[in-house]
Amino acid sequence: MRLMSALTGIAFVTSIAMASSALAQSDCTKTVPASPWGKEDQTGATNRITPAVTKAAAAEIKEGKVTSLTNDLVDGVPLFGTRFSKTVLTAGGLAPGAGLGKNDLTYMEDTWLSQSHVGTHLDGMGHIGRGDCYYNQIAMGKNINQNNMTKLGLEHLKPFQTRGVFIDMVKVYQQANKLKSNPNCRTPCIDKGTVITPDDLQAGLKLTNTTLREGDVVIIHTGWVDLFLQHPAKNTEYNSGEAGLGKAAAKWLIDQKIVAVGLDNWAVEVIPGESQDEAFPVHQMLLTDNGIHIIENVRTDLMAAQVASSGRGTFFFSMTVPKAVGLTGTFVAIDAIQ
């Protein structure tokens, strides 16, 4: 076992070295745009969250009502590909005679074995590239080690305290009489393979009389979250595809200078995609080319009900992102405050 572990470690380090030497020669100026915030930028679109933007967003808080946009993170939720997540409880302090001191103090702890892109999570800029080239023309092959990235880690992001804008795409499709739901959904949902267009986004904004402004985070409800909430029974169906952003819709959002976009599915963009020859092109458009963050597996059903009741599609968006050095993504906790 020790020999196998050693060989595995050697193989991993060797692969890193090969990647570094082979890919570090990339001329990323030819494949990825430069950041508008300068050649040293690793912050991306969160540069748009200025004190003035946060202060203006705080005006959205009228009653102090808090609605969660976060799915429970628990064993058994749908996971993409070979990703894993498992919790193990250590309750040694509860064993007979294990209490500490005269006051019989006991304790429990957890071991959390999980990849970072699980549950409601943020895709960082180091998650997606074009070949060796990542956000702001960074050649990633020479900026990684066995443990993490040395550039584009989550520690460079500004706090996500800004205005959120909610778009109920289910209502848009219902009003246009083009909703094709999935029979596995208990509530209306837009079926997989449906391309969300710029016209769809603008129709959704019109429902709440909202105009996007620089620094916003956009959250889109497709109803697909209902399959996530039926875990593990509907995990296969949840992972089989999704409605999502097409490339034109992504371009339109980029032009609005948003900070991030999140959907109630596992990839944000339409699956199956618009072209069989491309893999996750919207990810590259948003993250690699523009530093706009992606939030996946957002819980949108509660907010959809809230917006339907109040008619307000804007809110104070508060998302906690750990200062996780060198990580490509992370679980997040998101609250919508009105």
What spans do the regions from the language model cover?
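Active-/binding-site microenvironments in catalytic and ligand-binding cores
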Residues: 24-338
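Bacterial N-terminal signal peptides that target proteins for export
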Residues: 1-10
